[in-house]
Swiss-Prot record:
Transmembrane segments: none annotated. Component of the 30S ribosomal translation pre-initiation complex which assembles on the 30S ribosome in the order IF-2 and IF-3, IF-1 and N-formylmethionyl-tRNA(fMet); mRNA recruitment can occur at any time during PIC assembly. One of the essential components for the initiation of protein synthesis. Stabilizes the binding of IF-2 and IF-3 on the 30S subunit to which N-formylmethionyl-tRNA(fMet) subsequently binds. Helps modulate mRNA selection, yielding the 30S pre-initiation complex (PIC). Upon addition of the 50S ribosomal subunit IF-1, IF-2 and IF-3 are released leaving the mature 70S translation initiation complex. This is Translation initiation factor IF-1. Belongs to the IF-1 family. Residues 1-72 form the S1-like domain. The gene is infA. One of its GO terms (molecular function) is ribosome binding. It is found in: Cytoplasm.
Length: 72
């Protein structure tokens, strides 16, 4: 899979949902649902409410994303 056309934005975790999903408020004040990427799962990185994260979005569905990096 190529990363062409992917949109990367920063956001803040608002709530944790079940199944490794989170509600994230992006820097442009849009709230999306984001899943945790595979590498974050493998290395067991904890993501909590209030953390700043980097989210990757597909241009086809801007309401769902993938958390690819935890900033703090």
């Amino acid at each position: 899979m190529s990363k062409e056309g992917k949109i990367t934005l920063k956001g803040k975790v608002v709530t944790a949902l079940q199944g490794g999903q989170f509600k994230v408020l992006l820097e442009n004040n849009v709230e999306i649902i984001a899943n945790v990427s595979g590498k974050i799962r493998v290395y067991k990185i904890q993501i909590l409410k209030g953390d700043t994260v980097e989210v990757e979005l597909s241009p086809y569905d801007l309401t769902r994303g993938r958390i690819i990096y935890r900033i703090s």
